[in-house]
Amino acid sequence: MPVNSTAVSLASVTYISVEILIGLCAIVGNVLVIWVVKLNPSLQTTTFYFIVSLALADIAVGVLVMPLAIVISLGVTIHFYSCLLMTCLLMIFTHASIMSLLAIAVDRYLRVKLTVRYRRVTTQRRIWLALGLCWLVSFLVGLTPMFGWNMKLSSADKNLTFLPCQFRSVMRMDYMVYFSFFTWILIPLVVMCAIYFDIFYVIRNRLSQNFSGSKETGAFYGREFKTAKSLSLVLFLFALSWLPLSIINCIIYFNGEVPQIVLYLGILLSHANSMMNPIVYAYKIKKFKETYLLILKACVICQPSKSMDPSIEQTSE
């Protein structure tokens, strides 16, 4: 069937080309995010530590996940556990992203609920513990199939060693649906939506009360409202990018097959999320836009880059 063969080949080439483009954009964009935070002291706050963690996860998607996804799409014959490790790495950085988003949401919640005690609660030690916990959970969830929850145990051929490396050849779909999606993606997404709903509710109440006309307090909650809007947009884009692929996995598990082109589109959309956040920061956070321009001058116009003056307007923590 030469027509079908050509169609599949064309779909694969298109998929690989788009993956490479997305990967490059994700790497460049998120390296810029980290560079911006390094250059701008007003962005070196608790929330932006978690944003840097999210950027690192997105860089890993560009550097590791997308090349591995391309190898898996080609079905290269390798050892079972090498293939399984590759697919587990795909899972680790997905969960690192959602854990970082959850940490950001909790941080903003503490900021508006504990306005006076916030700095005492969010100590440097606790920030590093939270970051470590995010990544520890991500590795444990992502590497769970390596400890037995994989296709080798459910395969009729227990001596299976080498095989064409494809996602469903090694990864069990009940792990993907019940453990990865329902437990570690869907539940955190619902929790984060509830957190942001409460943040907006608290800010709206405080602004309507106006605190006896205190301009300083009004300005604080105004900044918090803008920050919460920007970060909730990041969360919305994550959900928009990852839910389609998760739903496709549910369809495969409960109902059978989906067209290969639909699967490719779901994968590409999920990976595209890694290049979206730097764009959101540039458009929604003034300090990011200013520092992006500073870097552009340094790189394109050959002016030396330097840290921005910490005395300039501070981003709310």
UniProtKB/Swiss-Prot annotation:
Membrane side Cytoplasmic: which residues? 38-48, 107-126, 198-230, 284-317
Q: Please give the coiled-coil regions recorded for this protein.
A: none
Q: What Gene Ontology terms for biological process does this UniProt record contain? A: G protein-coupled adenosine receptor signaling pathway
Q: Which Pfam families match?
A: 7tm_1
Sites of glycosylation?
4
Ribosomal protein is among the record's keywords: no
What CDD domains does the entry give? Answer: 7tmA_Adenosine_R_A3 (cd15070)
- Alphabetized SMART domains for the sequence: 7TM_GPCR_Srsx
Q: Which GO terms describe its molecular function?
A: G protein-coupled adenosine receptor activity
Membrane topology per the record?
Multi-pass membrane protein
InterPro entries tied to this protein: Adeno_A3_rcpt, Adenosn_rcpt, GPCR_Rhodpsn, GPCR_Rhodpsn_7TM
Any GO CC annotation of this UniProt entry: dendrite
S-palmitoyl cysteine lipidation: where?
Answer: 302
Instruction: Cite the ranges annotated as topological domain Extracellular.
Output: 1-14, 73-84, 149-176, 255-260
Chief location of this protein? Answer: membrane
Recorded superkingdom: Eukaryota
- PTM per UniProt? Phosphorylation on Thr-315 and Ser-316 may be crucial for rapid desensitization. Phosphorylation on Thr-315 may be necessary for phosphorylation on Ser-316 to occur.
Where in or outside the cell is it found?
A: Cell membrane
Q: What residue ranges are annotated as transmembrane?
A: 15-37, 49-72, 85-106, 127-148, 177-197, 231-254, 261-283
Keywords assigned by UniProt? Cell membrane, Disulfide bond, G-protein coupled receptor, Glycoprotein, Lipoprotein, Membrane, Palmitate, Phosphoprotein, Receptor, Transducer, Transmembrane, Transmembrane helix
Disulfide pattern: 83-165
Summarizing the function annotation, the protein's role is: Receptor for adenosine. The activity of this receptor is mediated by G proteins which inhibits adenylyl cyclase.
Q: Which PANTHER family match?
A: ADENOSINE RECEPTOR A3, OLFACTORY RECEPTOR AND ADENOSINE RECEPTOR
Protein family membership? Belongs to the G-protein coupled receptor 1 family.
UniProt protein name: Adenosine receptor A3
Taxonomically, what lineage is the organism?
Eukaryota, Metazoa, Chordata, Craniata, Vertebrata
